[in-house]
Every structure is written in C-alpha cells, then in structure tokens.
C-alpha cells in the first residue's frame, strides 16, 4: 500500500510541478519557489500554510511560481519531491521535513545544485540557508505553566502523564525541554510516552495504558505536546469514565481543539501564527531566489547537528484559553466565531464570552478603521514582517544575533 501511495503521490506531484520545468523561471524576476509540506492529516498545512505562503510569494514576486507537494507523512516521498524540484529548476525551496535526518541527503543535493533551502517549522539537517519557526522551548514553558495553574492546590501531589510528540521531530525534544524547565521539582511524572507521527490513535492507546496502570484517581493532569495528542488523551479519559476531566494541554490551535477548550474539555492550546511564519518563509525564499542574503531578515542564528549559525527567525508563541480565544484566534482571523460556535456550542460560547461579530463584520470594521487612519485591532505579526521586508530592501546582509539550539 505504501508503494502504491508513493506512486500516486509522485504522479500527482509531477502534474502539480509541471510549471517548474527546465527553462522556466530563468529571468531575474520570474522563478519557481518549491514548497514541500509534511502532512495532509494535520489541518493547518493545507488550510493555512500553503495558501498563505503562495499568496505572500506572489505579493513579493508577481512573476514567481510556487510548485507545491505534500508528503503525506512519508519521508521517502518527500525525498522524491525534493529531488524532483531540484531537477526541474526550482530556484529556492521551502520545506517542512517529515524526517529531518532522512532529508539530509536531499538538502545536500540542493546545495550542490546551488538551490537554497529554507527549513520551515522544523530545522532540517544539512546545509540549509534559513530557518523559520517558533521558540520551541517557550511552547513547552507555556504548556507547563498552564498545566500547573489548572491543577492548582487541589492536586497537591501533582502527578502527571507526559505525552510527547514524535521522537523523529527535533521540535519534540525542544518542547519537552521547555516544559521540564517549568515542571521539574513541581510535579511527579508518573508515565511518559512518545507518540509516533503525533497520531491521535497512538496517543489514545498510550493514555489508556497509563490509566490502566496507574488508576484514574492517581493522575492529576496531562502534558500533551499538541492538539492531535490532546484529542487522543481526552478520548481515553472519557472512555475510562474520568469525570471531571483532567487538565490537558495542547498546541496548534486546531479548530476541534478550540471547540474542546470552549466546552471545558481541554485546558489550553498554544497558537503559533500561521501567517507570521508563512510571511517570513516566503520572504526568505524570494530573497534567496533573487540571490540575496537572508541575514537582513534573520533575527538570530541556530545550530543543527550538521550545520552551525543558520540564519533564523524564531517567532513568539501565544497561549490560548477560553477567555482569550476572541482576542487571539478570532482577531487574527484564523477562525470566525461562527466557525467556533455551531448551534450545539452556542451556550458554551456565551459563557466564554464569544458573542462578538463574525469574521465578515470584523473585516468591514477594520476597513472602516483604515479609512479613518488606523487599524488598532490589526495583527502585530504583520507589522513585524513588514519591518523585515523593509530591512531587506534597505540594507545589505548582516550577521544574525544570538544563538539558539533547537531539537538537541
């Protein structure tokens, strides 16, 4: 089945990359940017990252094209996609690696072909030219602090289960390190699990095993690394008859997770602005495609196991609880209140204060405010990206500041 899937996806990839053939995009103002995303199962990639990157590339380089492919969580397929982009003449590639180690040889091949690679969300190994992600340690710290607050004094022993992400991802260790910096000496970690491919079903099985081994009355909270894992944890708690549900963290701001927060089933999620990350990645790729340095965009440098001082932008994650959904996700137009609050959640949304205007109303209000000479409700991230782009136009490359080491 895997071989069949690989054949199908490779065929579709060839069609989607047809505009990236040899001889195209050779002019200074017209070239192809490759975009490789890791999964079709996680909602954000197709709904947010892909269209936002495509839109931003077009805004920065009207004659450029984006050749897109999704690896469907298969590292072998992603290597094939990467190699195809190199062969077909992409001038820059944005890639979120399924497996950062497995992709190393393809990153090296891109370097030999003088095709710069921007690592997106996860730091791929090999000679990448730029990296954009969120501060993973801060993600973990936000989760740890939220879990401690939710458990409060009622859980004096603070016995938790720690549900980490896929060990293949360097971000998993990054998140865990941040969480442990907050939780160590304040909780007892009774069980700890790796959840392959961040899968909900695996998380549910692991949590079911933890409940069986420990007993539901001997767990006070669950540190879940992302929303897919949180979904599996909460499903297992419900199946075991745990009531009230335990505090459970998350990450990703998936719509179903936001709705669980509204219902009181999930404690929080960590929001990482899709638009902000997409804008920086597109800016880096277009700059590199034009033969310019990304040092003017980068705000720091990072080290991978293979490459030191990679120019990077590490963005700031934001915690989201029931009381902050409107001023984060709704304000940033990730979701409208109408999307978050179907009829069966209307009363819960009212309790959470989600009674404001729809996305359409919000957009109309913002347009009126812009006409009046301001946009006080605008997204701060956009201003930050604008400053990056102004820097690219105004000044030559300069070395990044500081050093971080994600995924070690």
Functional labels for PLM-detected ranges:
Residues 1-10:
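N-terminal export and membrane-targeting signals
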Residues 20-408:
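A residue-level marker of the well-folded mature domains of exported/periplasmic proteins
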Residues 15-19:
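C-terminal motif of bacterial Sec signal peptides marking the signal peptidase cleavage site
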